[in-house]
Amino acid sequence: LVDSVPAIARGIQLANEEIGIAPVSYETAKSIIGLGFKDIIPIVAPDLPESEYGRYKDIYVRYFLQSDPSLKLFPGVLELLRELQDAGIKTAIATGKSRKGLSRIVNRMNVWDYFDDSITADEALPKPDPLMLNTLLERNGLTMDEIVMIGDTEHDIKLGKAAGVRTIAVTWGAVSYTHLRAHET
């Protein structure tokens, strides 16, 4: 939905710098998009003691929020959401972000009205565990045959596969076509 890759990568790089741990590449920072925070830290800060995870997250969030004004919807997303709503098609968000983080972004983008439901990493096991999608299915009275998981990362595709639903990978987000193709259904 939102082009947050530069803000996420910058937040991770600056958090590592402030804590005094080895920097990560932009590509590594991109690779964690979609995961829950507890799964992210071992990748971007592998030597950080678990007792420091909370501090790291606070520092990362501070830097991410500094980039908040630069966040924007990907081209065509608003039009697609309008078309889906006009057609009576239910939409939901399954994200690795926290509820607070999701609410902040979706409110800022002014698109809450286009979604029937949402679930975050602090409400269910993180991607690719199927609990997120299974919970959305149950809450909305839908079956696996009635939904499609759309995502821009391998974690989204793995989530769809784990839940047994059809997936659509979009290539304008965090990772390349070639990378996504390796995880196609």
Language-model features: where?
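Short, acidic loop-to-helix structural element flanking the phosphoryl-transfer center
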Residues: 66-93, 99-103, 130
